[in-house]
């Protein structure tokens, strides 16, 4: 064993450059292995976190484009969702869906409180059922409710990140007024967000955003929970019929 060590040491002294390069290659390989393992675990954790964010039996429907030509109309036409689609979801598919609501967004709005502000935020109009679907956790105040919807109240629910930018004592913002697009909104709640991400969503009533920003019958996207679909075949049939009806 001693002779082997002497031989290795002697060879290393005679070939210093090759020894150095070999050592560097081994060290670099170990570093890359650790880095890739860490990145892989990070991606897995991010995917798990994203998949658990939404209720398991929830569904979100987005507008898109047509994939086929129809009666002289070309493919690639824009598909928009409107209030009629909310009614169809409730009436035609009532035995399969619950908590149907629209989700409308107004981008690049500023939120001001005194001399403090947060820029380029997204104002999102949702139904009171949204926290159930999106698993929104409130840390102060309340979420949008049915009275806000019915009376089109200018009430807003801020993220914790937004509230912290506006006030050091961010919980004290509940009950205070902030300005959004030069309109006064009362803060009724603050929700917990993932501060490692860029959280820019502030929630108001779906009916309010439609009125203030003249959205007409545009529904943006739809979100709802699903029930009474027990097999894969049931789910595939529902998806096919639902897509065809809207």
What are these regions (language model features)?
Residues 29-40:
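Alpha-helical transmembrane segments
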Residues 79-86, 91, 99-150, 198-208:
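The feature marks short, hydrophobic/small-residue-biased sequence motifs that occur predominantly
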Residues 1-31:
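N-terminal Sec/SRP start-transfer signal
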Residues 129-143, 154-246:
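Mid-to-C-terminal secondary-structure elements
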Residues 95, 121, 185-189:
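Small-residue-enriched segments and motifs
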Residues 41-108:
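Membrane-proximal extracellular/periplasmic loop immediately following the first transmembrane helix
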């Amino acid at each position: 064993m001693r002779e082997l060590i002497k031989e290795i040491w002697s060879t290393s002294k005679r070939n210093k450059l090759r020894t150095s390069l070999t050592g560097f290659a081994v060290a670099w390989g170990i570093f890359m292995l650790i880095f890739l393992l860490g990145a892989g675990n990070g991606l897995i954790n991010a995917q798990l976190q994203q998949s658990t964010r939404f209720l398991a039996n929830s569904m979100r429907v987005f507008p898109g484009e047509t994939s086929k030509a129809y009666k002289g109309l070309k493919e690639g036409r824009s598909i928009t969702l409107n209030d009629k689609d909310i009614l169809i979801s409730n009436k035609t598919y009532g035995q399969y869906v619950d908590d149907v609501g629209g989700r409308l967004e107004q981008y690049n709005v500023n939120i001001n409180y005194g001399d403090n502000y947060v820029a380029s935020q997204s104002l999102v109009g949702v139904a009171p059922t949204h926290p159930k679907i999106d698993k929104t956790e409130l840390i102060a105040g309340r979420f949008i409710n049915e009275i806000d919807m019915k009376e089109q109240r200018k009430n807003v629910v801020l993220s914790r990140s937004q509230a912290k930018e506006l006030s050091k004592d961010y919980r004290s913002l509940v009950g205070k007024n902030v300005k959004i697009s030069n309109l006064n909104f009362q803060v009724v709640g603050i929700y917990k967000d993932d501060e490692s991400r860029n959280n820019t969503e502030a929630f108001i009533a779906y009916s309010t955003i439609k009125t203030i920003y003249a959205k007409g019958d545009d529904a943006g996207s739809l979100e709802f929970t699903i029930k009474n679909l027990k097999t894969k075949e049931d789910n595939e049939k529902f998806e096919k019929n639902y897509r065809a009806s809207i």
